[in-house]
A protein has these predicted regions:
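Long, compositionally biased intrinsically disordered regions
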Residues: 77-225
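Catalytic or ion-translocation cores adjacent to nucleophile or general acid/base/metal-coordination motifs
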Residues: 2, 10-94, 136-155
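Hydrophobic transmembrane alpha-helical segments of multi-pass transport and channel proteins
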Residues: 5, 9, 50-70, 117, ...
């Protein structure tokens, strides 16, 4: 997950900057106005409620994983891979070999599709729903926040490097990523303990083992073995 987050950020930031520069050259104005850039920097600032929103977004990430698990279980329970593989209409349209490849592909990727689609809907719709009810609740996903930050910085150009607001927003990005992952993993961990009926004594042993691993090999939580 750490590698995935870093990979997303490393790709998103230069892509957004290049896209903004391309729009500036083609249309004569940046992708977002300076007023919008100023709002973006202040909304992402470490001095604001960004970390609270990041923790809330971690809950949404956990919810999307629940949707993914449900979708995969439903796919397997209904034997949809077999239906795709042997359905006469599908095999007639795609051919036997291609239908088999599609069935295999969907069996191994249905959870990813369900997770990404449900997360996209939640990230886009929940702030609108909460705003309708007067709740100023927003989302702070590390990849989206990094892209917004890059767009705001590109709007100002090189003078952005002298702006304190930019660096307060930059400082928030790693913490946003950490909260996204930690909150979602914590909720998943608690669910796993309940699902397996892990007793209090067993939980204490697990917590002790985690603490010992954290003290002895802290980087093993960040770098794949």
């Amino acid at each position: 997950q750490v590698a995935a987050v870093l990979g997303n950020v490393v790709v998103v930031v230069p892509t957004v900057v290049l896209l903004s520069l391309g729009i500036s050259l083609a249309l004569g104005h940046p992708m977002i106005s300076e007023k919008e850039a100023e709002y973006t920097l202040h909304s992402l600032s470490l001095l604001g409620p960004t970390l609270l929103f990041a923790a809330f977004t971690g809950c949404l990430l956990f919810a999307s994983s629940i949707v993914a698990g449900w979708a995969e279980n439903w796919f397997v329970l209904q034997r949809l891979d077999s239906a795709m593989r042997y359905n006469p209409r599908i095999t007639g349209l795609l051919g036997t070999a291609r239908a088999d490849r599609w069935a295999h592909f969907m069996r191994h990727n249905i959870s990813g599709f369900a997770s990404n689609i449900s997360l996209g809907f939640m990230l886009g719709l929940i702030p609108a729903f909460t705003a309708f009810f007067g709740l100023p609740l927003e989302v702070r996903h590390v990849t989206l926040s990094a892209g917004q930050l890059a767009a705001a910085a590109a709007s100002y150009g090189l003078p952005a490097l002298t702006m304190p607001a930019l660096w307060w927003a930059v400082a928030a990005i790693p913490l946003v990523g950490a909260l996204n992952l930690c909150v979602s993993f914590y909720l998943a961990y608690q669910l796993a303990l309940r699902a397996h009926n892990v007793s209090g004594v067993q939980r204490s042993h697990i917590h002790t083992a985690i603490r010992q691993r954290l003290l002895r090999k802290p980087f093993s939580f960040l770098i794949p073995g």
